[in-house]
Regions:
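Small beta-barrel nucleic-acid-binding modules, primarily SNase/OB-fold domains
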Residues: 2-150
Length: 150
């Protein structure tokens, strides 16, 4: 059973089936578009190997965030407004599908957090998700920035 779970997790990590040829989704807040690595500004999603607890079940919340993004993008190509570079030389941008901010969508769905250290842009969306116990707000979780420290 553990081997099957491991295979499933690996498959989901690299799942980009159905996406435009010029697009790869790295994780919940990072894409590669036309060879350019783009980090969504103002939000933070759980790391791919990060888990949450829902009832007595362990949930791969980082993979859930990525899969939500894959599903939202579908076979469309995001349009991104670049805002500069981060310390890792990734382009920081807000990206849109059919006029909707992917960052706002992820935060409002409860699988991303307003990254208050850098921006106050998505606080309303986070409050909505928290009040309605959406996504990770319905589980026990560790903030991604705390998870990365451990």
């Amino acid at each position: 059973m553990k081997n099957l779970l491991g295979i499933l997790v690996l498959g989901l990590l690299w799942c980009n089936v159905g996406l435009a040829d010029n697009l790869k989704i790295v994780d919940g807040d990072t894409i590669i578009l036309n060879g350019e690595k783009i980090r969504f500004s103002g939000i933070d999603t759980p790391e791919l190997k990060q888990t949450c607890i829902s009832g007595d079940q362990k949930v791969f919340c980082g993979i859930s965030a990525k899969m939500l993004l894959v599903k939202k993008i579908g076979n469309e190509t995001p349009k991104c407004i670049r805002e500069g570079k981060d310390v890792y030389k990734r382009t920081l941008a807000e990206c849109f599908i059919n006029g909707e901010s992917l960052s706002a969508f992820l935060v409002r769905s409860g699988y991303a957090f307003a990254y208050r250290k850098y921006s106050d842009k998505f606080i309303k969306e986070e409050e909505f998700a928290k009040e309605n116990k959406l996504g990770m707000w319905s589980m026990k979780f560790e903030y991604p920035w705390d998870f990365r420290k451990s």
